[in-house]
Amino acid sequence: MRVAEQLGMPPPATIQNAYSLLCRSFDSDLAEVCSPRNHNVGLLPWSVLCGGLLSGKYRPSARAEASARFVAFEDYMRRWHPAHARDVTLTAADEYAAIAERAGLSPAELAILWCRTRRSIAHGSVIVGATTLAQLQQNLDAFTLPLESLTDEMIEEIDAVHMRCRDPSNSL
């Protein structure tokens, strides 16, 4: 901020950080400085599906396709990889998927919708990734869901999972 001011340039408008149901370090590290009361820098989150872990396709009850990233690439995003992730990470991902199912949403829709409702997110914007056109369409469909689709009851359930499985990516 100071450098931009010293150079007579506009200040940063957004910051890109990994942010998801499983990775919330922004909330404790940067949310206050980025808030509208301070520097008003919105978060533009990436890795909202944690490399696909929050898509539901790696649940114990699911059978991931051979072309799925974590199947095809053993070392891809190791902290989220089902073969390498901590048990608490997999437990949280499975519990979030169950919340989505009870609400009639896909796990990916829940993960994206949750990010969109966070106060720090820049204009509800979220960076999504996909391997297939079908995945891209599912991710885009999540942006058509009204924010009210995430009910207070669902938020309470999400918060309860978070309290039991607090930021599992921070303890690698």
Language model features: what each stretch is:
Residues M1-D29:
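Glycine/proline-rich, positively charged
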Residues V3-G8, A31-C34, P60-A64, F143-P146:
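Short, hinge-like loop/turn segments at secondary-structure boundaries
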Residues A4-P12, N38-H39, G104, L147-L150:
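Short helix-capping segments at alpha-helix termini
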Residues L7, V48-L49, P82-P146:
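Conserved short secondary-structure transition element at the edge of the structured enzyme core
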Residues P11-Q16, N40-L44, S125-I127:
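Structural preference for beta-strand elements that scaffold enzyme active sites
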Residues A18-S25, S47-Y58, W114, T131-T132:
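Glycine-rich beta-alpha junction loops
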Residues V33-I99, I121, P168-L172:
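Glycine-rich, positively charged active-site loop/lid region within alpha/beta enzyme cores that binds
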Residues P107-W114, T151-V161:
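Short, well-structured alpha-helical segments that form the helix of a local strand-helix-strand
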